[in-house]
Amino acid sequence: MKQIILTTITILYVSAIFGQTKTNNGFADFNEFKLNKPSLKFDFQLKQRSGGDIFLTGGISNYRLKKIKPVNEVGKVEEKIWGVTVGDSIYINAYPFSKVKGYNLIIEKGYYTYFIGEPARTEKEQRELGIIKPTEKQIMVCCQAGYVILPDGTIKLLRPELLLDLCKDNDDLAKEIKAANFKLENVYKMNDILKKYNLTKK
């Protein structure tokens, strides 16, 4: 009996790590993610970037999809689809909004969905994400950043002023945000505010 249980656990673990599935596991766009109805199916190995890889090439500890099958879909998986699901977790493709290859774990899906990713490095994407203002030029970026996905699918850098605007209809949270005087690097604390706000929308 113990051997059967161990074998079952091993199979489930390997399936989760390698993303092998008989059901659809790829989201073509935001609407599929919102409805939780992936229309695409791939086999792949989900790997978190190692410290050595980050040291050599830069970036953050996000994820890569390896050994993608079918092989003729590699470009699509790396640069075009919205995201993938592995077990109970969802990973958003960073390339469409940042032009940086990799996948980021969705921390919470709700009225406002949020995750931590790498800042965009190109001017067009920096402007669209709110990293720079319309009149500003491209800037050098590094390290990780907080992102929020609005109800219409728009992705924005989670700035303190944006957080206040998103939660302004909740007096208690608005007061908490103002009192906290958040900085851009206070990603996890701002995520906690979004989590509280999402609870009011259920």
Where does each model-flagged region fall?
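Bacterial Sec-dependent N-terminal signal peptides
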Residues: 1-24
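Aromatic-patch recognition
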Residues: 22-174
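C-terminal partner/receptor-binding element of secreted or periplasmic proteins
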Residues: 164-202
